[in-house]
Structure formats: structure tokens, C-alpha cells
Amino acid sequence: IARKAGLRAVPHGGELLGPEHLREVLDFLKPTRLGHGVRAAESPDVLRRVIDEGVAFEVCPASNVSLGVYSEASGVPVRTLMDAGATIALGADDPLLFLSRLTAQYETLREQGFDDAELAALASSSVEASFADGASKRTWKAEIQDWLAADPSNDDDAEAHGA
């Protein structure tokens, strides 16, 4: 119904109900983006299918922990999804409900050992997964590359790199 009306739909799946639920979401809803989907990491076949079908994951570590999917943010399989080649849009998911902020999600990944290049790749992946127009995506990706190229030894650039 949503597609026929010209609306975008992002079904939620693969969070509380696991990878089998993702199979159903993929079969019946044919999404281009999934709300969560993190438990695809538990099934190599499901994860490969999501990637092969070009479906992006919206990964929200704070809500995954708040909902008890993982006991701590380090358990959220962002690294597994990223290493498999998944398109990931890092998100805060209902900031008023979970009291989460997007910058805190990036800080969490930094604490888990993600370097500047990996954080920039996640930011670019988030832009790519967005429903923004092509010109906006190009602009934002260029800004991400500018951030990555900035010299953290310069006082003005150091703060941007979390120094």
C-alpha cells in the first residue's frame, strides 16, 4: 500500500525475533532498508541475502541494548555486518524514548576500536542508505571525506576527530 502511494517503507525486523523473522520480511515486504536487522549476523545465509539484495541496515546500538537484544553496546555486531560488506546506516532510534544521540553511537564505536576511516565509511554508508536526492548525497559524502582528510594535529581539526 505504501509503495503504491509513493511512500517509503522501512520495516523493522531481525532485532527481537532473530534471523528467521528477517527471511519473512525479505520474502514478503521486499525492503530496501531494514529497521535494525542486526541479528542477521547470527545467520550467514540471511546476512548474505540481505547484502546481495542491496538492503541497508539501520543499526541503533543504544536501542538494541535498551530493549535487551544485547547486554552491552559492544555486543551489537556492527563490525560483523561491516566486514561482511553490509550497507549500514548508524542511527539513534527514538532519541526521546531511548535518550540516545547519534554522536553517542559513533563514540561507542570509537571506544570499540573503530578508526577514523571506518567511522567515515559508516557515515558515508548512512548517507547512501538515506532517501535523500543524489545531489545531497554527493555533498554530504564530500563533507565526510573532508572530515577524514582533516589534519587532527591542527587544533581546529582535532576536536572534529575526537581528540
Give the ranges of each region predicted by the language model.
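Mid-to-C-terminal alpha-helical segments outside catalytic/metal-binding sites
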Residues: 104, 114-163
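Alpha-helix N-cap/helix-start motif
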Residues: 18, 43, 98-102, 137
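Short, hydrophobic/aliphatic alpha-helical segments
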Residues: 1-3, 76-85
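Short acidic/histidine-rich active-site segments
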Residues: 10-16, 81-101
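Structural recognition of alpha->loop->beta junctions
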Residues: 25-40, 80-88, 105-117, 121
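Active-site core of metal-dependent hydrolases
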Residues: 1-69
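Hydrophobic alpha-helical scaffolding
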Residues: 12, 36-37, 71, 92-96, ...
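Charged helix-capping and loop-helix junction motifs
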Residues: 20, 71-79
